[in-house]
């Protein structure tokens, strides 16, 4: 890259669904010679995770309003104003060429500060239903991108950036052809686990017996209780762990996955080429349902809403899927994936920097 080194500021915080896609784009652009800095909050996961990736991070003080009391609502304008002023100072000191908003509370004040400083804002919405912050920022953004169709009416669909080790997995036809033995069921409730999965899957294991074998991530603190549930069901032989560090290896092992349908999980399942049973988290805007719907429409997954997620319903589904069916579903999942999402988002950042 000739001339002045281009500078990007990534705004993302709160959850892995915002932070990990931001890191993927950051690393891609750093490899192209860009300088990258991060805007986050000091009390969320980005505070420790981002520096581990060799990226400096600045903090502003901001938190969400949903579920907060009246006093928090009344003082919100003051807190937002202060956060915007903090972000403006950071922008002036760093002087980024582009700001990339990947979601989380930090994106609101950060995006407004960038706009006030004349810095182009590129937004990426990871979910099938746009969050409040991104809906507001879309009015001032130079470019709006979405992972799934429908979050914004006219935004480009670019997918969600996912980890390179997941993208590097062999295609389903290579990975799954010739497999024999019990169906391998990977159960993921996210790093915090999901109680409904932990309660139900031991009963599914008991129902299907030797037809399946499970690798079950139960989440922090749930291992003793869930292990005991498997033992009481006479199913102590399954692999039950608190957390899976190498998700790519878990995807490579699995024939089918049972999980929530957070945006990043859905995108990773598609990129890996895996059939899925999705259990959307019951949020008022049904965000996770809309994330999972494209894969169900493609014939790659089934959505079971939480009230209907029982040992009987799950056992019936799994028992009806033979290996040929699972391979077909896996190939359909892969066909709707957008494996070059990282490159697509990065290209829009580069384009915004040139037209600034």
From Swiss-Prot:
One of the GO biological process terms: cell wall organization
Pathway participation: Cell wall biogenesis; peptidoglycan biosynthesis
The answer to whether keyword 4Fe-4S applies is no
Q: How does it sit in the membrane?
A: Peripheral membrane protein
Source organism of this protein record: Yersinia pseudotuberculosis serotype O:1b (strain IP 31758)
Q: In which compartments does the protein localize?
A: Cell inner membrane
Q: Which UniProt keywords apply?
A: Cell cycle, Cell division, Cell inner membrane, Cell membrane, Cell shape, Cell wall biogenesis/degradation, Glycosyltransferase, Membrane, Peptidoglycan synthesis, Transferase
Write out the residues that bind UDP-N-acetyl-alpha-D-glucosamine.
15-17, 127, 163, 191, 244, 263-268, 288
Catalyzed reactions per annotation: di-trans,octa-cis-undecaprenyl diphospho-N-acetyl-alpha-D-muramoyl-L-alanyl-D-glutamyl-meso-2,6-diaminopimeloyl-D-alanyl-D-alanine + UDP-N-acetyl-alpha-D-glucosamine = di-trans,octa-cis-undecaprenyl diphospho-[N-acetyl-alpha-D-glucosaminyl-(1->4)]-N-acetyl-alpha-D-muramoyl-L-alanyl-D-glutamyl-meso-2,6-diaminopimeloyl-D-alanyl-D-alanine + UDP + H(+)
Q: What is this protein called?
A: UDP-N-acetylglucosamine--N-acetylmuramyl-(pentapeptide) pyrophosphoryl-undecaprenol N-acetylglucosamine transferase
Q: What class of enzyme is it?
A: transferase
